[in-house]
Amino acid sequence: MHIGVPLETQTGETRVAATPETIKKLIGQGHKVTVQSGAGIKASVVDSAYETAGATIGSANDAFGAELILKVVAPSDSELALIKSGTVLVGMLNPFSNETIAKLAEHGITAFALEAAPRTSRAQSLDVLSSQANIAGYKAVLLAAHHYPRFMPMLMTAAGTVKAARVLILGAGVAGLQAIATAKRLGAVIEASDVRPAVKEQIESLGAKFVDVPYETDEERECAVGVGGYARPMPTSWMQRQALAVHERAKQADIVITTALIPGRKAPTLLSADTVAQMKPGSVVIDLAAAQGGNCPLTVADQVVVENGVIICGPTNLAGAVAADASALYARNLLDFLKLVFTKEGQFEINLEDDIVAACLMCRDGQVIRKNA
């Protein structure tokens, strides 16, 4: 099959959907691969590296004219115009955007959005959300350290002792846990909160203190369990108690990193404007939910703002700041997914009996398969 790897043109996107490592494996399976010239430059992969792996370097028309296209994000309108009806598209296509999926269906594209893969052990190797969130959690701490006007670790010097930074992490999914681990390596004192009681042990195993907000009703306990590894919206009663606990700890914190997301919904508010107003001058907030509205109402996507002396950062693509490794991990995720849609003979086949394939299939034959509420 002819596989195309175009240059990502979305503003700020630095990643590429295939690396020489994964392309070599695809060619070894009998496929032909065309990479758009310059596609990997921002991820530290030059055209000659792709050629050495066996790929052909071509234009945007060449890459988008392939039978199967590997992308990082959904194609723009101008890119859609280059894609033929019947083409297969695989990438992070925003499965919760009805408008995006409808456009792909109108163009006759067979689209697979890997964000929709189930959170099961079998799907771990192609879990793009986890591979990219892991990087975002790491980079969030480094971004916080960059803006924080003090040291992170405790230092004892001849000029006196410097206290360790106090870090509060809200949301202990993949990004949150990596943020805990990274902040710990930098010598910070860490507290972390999450709606799911099951992560308490994980938080403590990384050296952080769990901010415990007890459940008072069966409804609260049921919602806290989550669905498919994701958090669910919590009842108002619990959110009010959690907000109070966060408020008190945020006032003492030097750095707050928020990571809470709910698939297909606006990000929950975890850090109120009133809380920010009472935080210490010079403290830093890194809002990893900025792309979905933010966990703090003062967050502005892709900007750094200062409110009452508090520095608030709203990055929407932190994984892209580590483009080389983010691309390498993402490309491996795609490669593992392609194993599910190619037969041993290298023929493309959609097996809807496979729960991963069925979950990721957004549209085919002009019809939207996944419909969001």
What are the functions of these language-model segments?
Residues 6-41, 45, 153-249:
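Glycine-rich phosphate/diphosphate-binding loop of Rossmann-like nucleotide-binding domains
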Residues 2, 8, 75-166:
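Glycine/serine-rich phosphate-binding loop and adjoining beta1-alpha1 elements at the start
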Residues 95-123, 265-319:
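Rossmann-fold NAD(P)-binding glycine/threonine-rich loop
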Residues 12-17, 78-83, 91, 229, ...:
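Glycine/threonine-rich flexible loop motifs
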Residues 121-159, 290, 296-373:
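Adenosine-phosphate binding glycine-rich loop
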Residues 54-64, 74-75, 221-256, 260-273, ...:
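A structured beta-alpha segment of the ubiquitous adenosine-cofactor-binding alpha/beta core
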Residues 2-103, 107:
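An N-terminal-biased, well-structured beta-alpha scaffold segment characteristic
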Residues 23, 47, 80, 101, ...:
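Generic hydrophobic/aromatic pocket-lining and core-packing "Φ" positions
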